């Protein structure tokens, strides 16, 4: 067993006492099957003080993104930085450092090959600045300057890149306090290819919390996936997607405070006002 962990670049298995589980009001956070089944299903759009927040179809989400790039001239790296910062901020609010005791909490960030993976890289960098200890698994990096730069930034900040993830859920549960799902975003379609099919299968057996960026990976953007991963935290970016109505985790945040008011009105997003200068807003 120790030889396997050495092969994975993970070192000796750390005992669970080193990284105590996050303690919430009323007891520990253990997002296993019991808490998942007990959560009520959230149907329809979220009702906020200012009205009903719109949940986007895949087509609507793509149209909003295209207008941000083409009409409003945002760049990909610009929105990626804002989105990744939002994700790290939401994680820090849902799982504050004070919940973990004296040791910096270890966080496994699993990044996919697209922009969602880029959001994860930015998120990891900000988590490091916030005092967490992220490690990244990035098995399918695109050959593009933007992603090369994001990887370099993480490496310069001494964030390790792991060649493999532990092959058993219990190993991840022992080594990490949180897993960030940055594999697939709202534009994903079709069957899940390897190595991500195996990774999602491992994640489906975790008891540590999963934080999903924009959409839980492996879920249909509109219909969800009753047999898919079950995140404890969902960070919807720009606006929530329809699959978020099926989210039954503890924390749902909205991030990506960059939507121009005219674009919001055009698509009737009805986004709630962000508090003060915050870049995230808690929806549940």
Curated annotation (Swiss-Prot):
Amino-acid positions noted as binding K(+) in the UniProt annotation, renumbered to this chain? 116, 181, 217
Biological process GO terms, please? lipid transport; membrane raft distribution; negative regulation of angiogenesis; nicotinamide nucleotide metabolic process; regulation of cholesterol efflux; sprouting angiogenesis
Q: What EC identifiers does the entry list? A: 5.1.99.6
Q: Where is the transit peptide?
A: 1-55
Recorded family membership: Belongs to the NnrE/AIBP family.
Coiled-coil zones: none
What compartments host this protein?
Mitochondrion; Secreted
Q: Which reaction does it catalyse?
A: (6R)-NADHX = (6S)-NADHX; (6R)-NADPHX = (6S)-NADPHX
**PANTHER family found in the cross-reference section:** NAD(P)H-HYDRATE EPIMERASE
The record's principal subcellular location, in a coarse class, is: mitochondrion
Report whether Secreted shows up as a keyword of the record. yes
Enzyme class label: isomerase
UniProt entry tagged with the keyword Methyltransferase: no
What Pfam families does this protein map onto?
Answer: YjeF_N (PF03853)
> Where would I find the YjeF N-terminal domain in this sequence?
61-271
**Cofactor(s) for this protein?**
K(+)
Q: Which residues carry this modification: N6-succinyllysine?
A: 140
Note on how the cofactor is bound: Binds 1 potassium ion per subunit.
> Per UniProt, what is the name of the gene that codes for the protein in this document?
NAXE
Function text: Catalyzes the epimerization of the S- and R-forms of NAD(P)HX, a damaged form of NAD(P)H that is a result of enzymatic or heat-dependent hydration. This is a prerequisite for the S-specific NAD(P)H-hydrate dehydratase to allow the repair of both epimers of NAD(P)HX. Accelerates cholesterol efflux from endothelial cells to high-density lipoprotein (HDL) and thereby regulates angiogenesis.
| Positions with a binding annotation for (6S)-NADPHX | 115-119, 185-191, 214
Q: Name one GO molecular function term.
A: metal ion binding
UniProt-recorded name of the protein: NAD(P)H-hydrate epimerase
Keywords assigned by UniProt, alphabetized? Isomerase, Lipid transport, Metal-binding, Mitochondrion, NAD, NADP, Nucleotide-binding, Potassium, Secreted, Transit peptide, Transport
User: What quaternary arrangement does the UniProt entry report?
Assistant: Homodimer. Interacts with APOA1 and APOA2.
């Amino acid at each position: 067993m120790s030889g396997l962990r050495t092969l994975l670049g993970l070192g000796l298995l750390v005992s669970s006492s080193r990284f105590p589980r996050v303690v919430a009001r009323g007891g520990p956070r253990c997002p296993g099957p019991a808490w998942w089944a007990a959560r009520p299903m959230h149907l329809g759009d979220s009702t906020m003080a200012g009205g009903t927040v719109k949940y986007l179809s895949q087509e609507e989400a793509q149209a909003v993104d295209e207008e941000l790039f083409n009409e409003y001239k945002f760049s990909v790296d610009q929105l990626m930085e804002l989105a990744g910062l939002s994700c790290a901020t939401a994680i820090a609010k849902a799982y504050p450092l004070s919940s973990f005791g004296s040791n910096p909490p270890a966080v496994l960030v699993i990044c996919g090959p697209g922009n969602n993976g880029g959001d994860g890289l930015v998120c990891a960098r900000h988590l490091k600045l916030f005092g967490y200890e992220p490690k990244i698994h990035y098995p399918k990096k695109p050959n593009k300057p933007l992603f090369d730069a994001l990887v370099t930034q993480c490496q310069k900040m001494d964030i390790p890149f792991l060649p493999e993830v532990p092959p058993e859920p219990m190993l991840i549960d022992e080594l990490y306090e949180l897993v960030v799902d940055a594999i697939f975003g709202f534009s994903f379609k079709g069957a899940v290819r390897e190595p991500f099919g195996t990774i999602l299968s491992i994640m489906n057996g975790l008891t540590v919390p999963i934080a999903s960026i924009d959409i839980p990976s492996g879920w249909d953007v509109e219909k969800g996936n009753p047999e898919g991963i079950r995140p404890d935290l969902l960070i919807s970016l720009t606006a929530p997607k329809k699959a978020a109505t099926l989210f039954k985790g503890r924390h749902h945040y909205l991030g990506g405070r960059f939507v121009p008011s005219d674009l919001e009105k055009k698509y009737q997003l009805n986004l709630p006002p962000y508090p003060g200068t915050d870049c995230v807003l808690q929806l549940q």
